[in-house]
A protein has these predicted regions:
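Surface-exposed, glycine-biased beta-strand/turn segments
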Residues: 2-79, 86-91, 105-108, 112-115, ...
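A solvent-exposed, charged loop/short amphipathic helix patch at secondary-structure junctions
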Residues: 96-107
């Protein structure tokens, strides 16, 4: 089936994967579009890019995802979204700060084309946080269909993190 041929995405965190939220849960005003990885009650864990691609969107807001990075993976036909971030990697942060000064505003929503901010599988793109509308430190992660924008169940791409005999 198509399900069996899905790519395995790189682990976003180098800590044992524990979920605090699942895909499709009914929240107060929306369906949960991704999965939430617990971060041991702390912020500041390195977040690793799931696959080769490019940063396609950066969000900074006092609510919602707070700080978020969207990475487009053209070869996989996917977009991965990393939310509630404490901070961005230096190459991403430089762009964010310049834009905040230019616009004289904290809130930004910037989109980028392929080639502008390339990222590699496993590259550190941010630090985990508790920003935006977050009830405690965690990493929110979406996997979306590049063509339709539909939210996909991330567990289909991260099964290997949960059902293996590797313990760290």
């Amino acid at each position: 089936s198509a399900q069996e041929n899905l790519p395995e995405l790189h682990r976003p965190l180098n800590i044992p994967p524990v979920l605090s939220g699942n895909f499709g849960e009914l929240r107060s005003n929306h369906f949960h579009s991704g999965i939430d990885f617990k971060t041991q009650g702390r912020t500041g864990f390195k977040i690793h890019c799931a696959a080769d691609g490019y940063v396609s969107r950066i969000l900074v807001s006092p609510w919602g995802f707070g700080r978020a990075v969207y990475v487009t993976h053209p070869q996989l036909g996917l977009v991965t979204v990393y939310g509630h971030l404490e901070s961005f990697s230096s190459k991403i942060n430089k762009i964010v700060v310049e834009e905040q000064y230019r616009r004289e505003t904290f809130r930004i929503d910037m989109e980028f084309k392929e080639g502008e901010i390339p990222v590699k599988k496993g590259e550190v793109i941010a630090l985990s946080g508790n920003a935006g509308s977050s009830g405690g430190p965690h990493l929110h992660m979406d996997v979306r269909d590049l063509a339709t924008g539909d939210a996909l169940d991330p567990m289909n791409y991260f099964k290997h993190l949960f059902f293996s005999f590797e313990f760290y």
